[in-house]
């Protein structure tokens, strides 16, 4: 909660600096939280911790826990897990507090597919594929960040012989996933597979325009898929009333 001279923007660089913290505030605070990393290594965490200790070290002795936020790419091949463990142990022992690390995208890095079917192909300055998937409903980060999701057998526009704009079947102007090129022409009924979708797809899904939620399947090591859950009209209705 921000008031007075404190910014209400949680991403503001001047949200709270150490000189703005009232001396009696710590009586009401059980822990501190920072979230400064995004797809970063343990060396960046080490740099952040040094800054936190320099600015807020005195308060760390008075609180019960420290949340180091997310953005730790723990499962990345070159991630220094030993350094992460060393830093967590050091903070715990130095300040006698509990340490939390948010799971973040690392737990599902490079995992998950969003399968979509080409419903129609229209021409409007560029050939456009109308999909049964939607950026607004199923991949909102595409519009919010913005972000260009990886597509199996898809390349940058004009890189390959056939370039298309990938759109959806909602009424939202701008519900466009992006422009991709392919080695071969795409036809109505073709399946396309967006990759690295386990992170921010299901947790952000919505039923805008009555667009259905995608079914969730689990693929085993042999490539066999089993249905975990399917969604229908009743799920849409119950979210509204």
Per-segment meaning from a language model:
Residues 1-10:
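Single conserved hydrophobic/aromatic residue that forms the stacking wall/gate
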Residues 11-13, 28-33, 63-67, 98-100, ...:
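Structural preference for beta-strand elements that scaffold enzyme active sites
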Residues 21-29, 56-61:
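Acidic (Asp/Glu)-rich catalytic clusters
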Residues 28-38, 188-190:
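Internal alpha/beta core interface subdomains
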Residues 35-55, 128, 132-134, 155-156:
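Active-site pocket-lining/capping segments in soluble small-molecule metabolic enzymes
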Residues 36-37, 66-75, 103-105:
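Glycine-rich beta-strand-to-loop/alpha-helix junction loops that act as flexible
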Residues 85-94:
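Alpha-helix-loop-beta-strand connector modules within alpha/beta enzyme cores
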Residues 87, 103-241:
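Charged (often Lys/Glu-rich) extended helix/loop segments that serve as interaction or gating elements
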């Amino acid at each position: 909660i921000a008031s007075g001279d404190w910014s209400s923007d949680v991403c503001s660089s001047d949200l709270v600096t150490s000189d703005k913290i009232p001396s009696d505030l710590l009586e009401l605070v059980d822990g501190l939280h920072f979230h400064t990393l995004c797809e970063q290594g343990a060396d960046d965490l080490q740099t952040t911790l040094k800054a936190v200790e320099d600015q807020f070290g005195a308060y760390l002795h008075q609180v019960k826990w420290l949340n180091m936020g997310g953005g730790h790419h723990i499962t990345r091949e070159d991630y220094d897990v030993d350094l992460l463990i060393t830093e967590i142990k050091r903070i715990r022992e130095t300040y006698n507090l509990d340490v939390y690390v948010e799971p973040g995208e690392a737990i599902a890095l490079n995992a998950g597919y969003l399968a979509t079917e080409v419903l129609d192909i229209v021409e409007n300055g560029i050939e456009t594929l109308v999909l049964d998937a939607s950026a607004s409903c199923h991949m909102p980060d595409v519009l919010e960040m913005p972000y260009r999701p990886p597509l199996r057998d898809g390349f940058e526009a004009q890189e390959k012989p056939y370039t298309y704009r990938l759109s959806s079947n909602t009424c939202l102007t701008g519900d466009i996933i992006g422009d991709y090129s392919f080695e071969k022409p795409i036809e109505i009924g073709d399946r396309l597979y967006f990759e690295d979708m386990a992170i921010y797809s299901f947790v952000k899904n919505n039923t805008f325009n009555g667009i259905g939620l995608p079914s969730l399947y689990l693929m085993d090591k042999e490539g066999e898929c089993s249905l975990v859950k399917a969604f229908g009209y009743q799920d849409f209705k119950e979210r509204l009333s």
